[in-house]
Amino acid sequence: MTTLNLSNDALAAAAVNQVLADLVTSISGRGGVKCITTLNGTNAAPTGTGITNKATLVTAGWTVTTN
């Protein structure tokens, strides 16, 4: 997977946070492959650890777009 587009799915903050957490967990198994992840549109913005997880993904070279 190189692109994950979940924009405009009306996800609550808890769901956005969970997606980001799951993606952080998957980093070690991806062998350095980067992913473009889109979670904006009608989705809630990440909160708390979701913000931290987004930063972790960006630091790993991913492109992550959220509200």
What kind of region is each of these model predictions?
Residues M1-N67:
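Solvent-exposed loop and capping/linker segments of extracellular ligand-binding repeat ectodomains
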